[in-house]
Amino acid sequence: MVKADVEAAIAGGTATAAKSQAGAPASTPAAPKPMSDDAVLKLFEEGSYELVPHDNMRKTIARRLVEAKSTIPHFYLTLDCEIDALLALRKQLNDAAPMKKTEKGEAPAYKLSVNDMVIKAMAVALMQVPDANASWTESGMLKHKHADVGVAVSIPGGLITPIVRKADEKTLSVISNEMKDMAVRARSRKLKPEEYQGGTTAVSNLGMFGIKDFSAVINPPHATILAVGAGEERPIVRNGEIKIANVMTVTLSTDHRAVDGALGAELLAAFKRTIENPLGMLV
């Protein structure tokens, strides 16, 4: 925005005010409507398909996604994270896991996944960049005191996002065990509403499907969501030499009303710093 933009806005505002005094205000254009069911069905030969009615979950997902994309101005930021140090630390921690007795015999007390460490890194980053740990409301900005990280979990017929509350205060082992428990109960649709409603941000990971990078839709009232791609060996240039490193691409979607581009970049840089120096997640 420059001086000319401000002057034009002032002039336009004055002209608009004068016009609205002279006549009725212009009506807001109607939102475009999707194709009707009849219009869609006419495109296909009768008998060439089966019409499966939507269940309540699919209807809710559709409504929430339309709401998110039509009311939230999405802004996207992407960068690569080297994860060799993270993978080494994960192996070291898993190898050191104490054994505990279970119904099926002895088993490790925890088994960390890369996604568990991503959840913790996102929580750490939000604590380092607290202005990005926010939610937009028309009356003001909600500044959250803790990082409640939602994690997208695919379930039969849809998607749900259980939330790791106060992930900034929890250890990696607690996050890991909590996520495993909620993921199992999510797939059997046994989560309590308070376990998937709310939250301050979310993580969506499609790396297990080999997806390199993608962008995710923000889940209101969140102002951010992190899309995580697959970790893979890639050539990198370090000190003028080509080397091979394990690299993971991440894309941060932000609600531009709450998190401007520079603030989102600061948050993503803090996430990258934590992922590439993972010992910081242990203190």
Predicted region positions:
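C-terminal catalytic/motor cores of large multi-domain enzyme assemblies
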Residues: 5-283
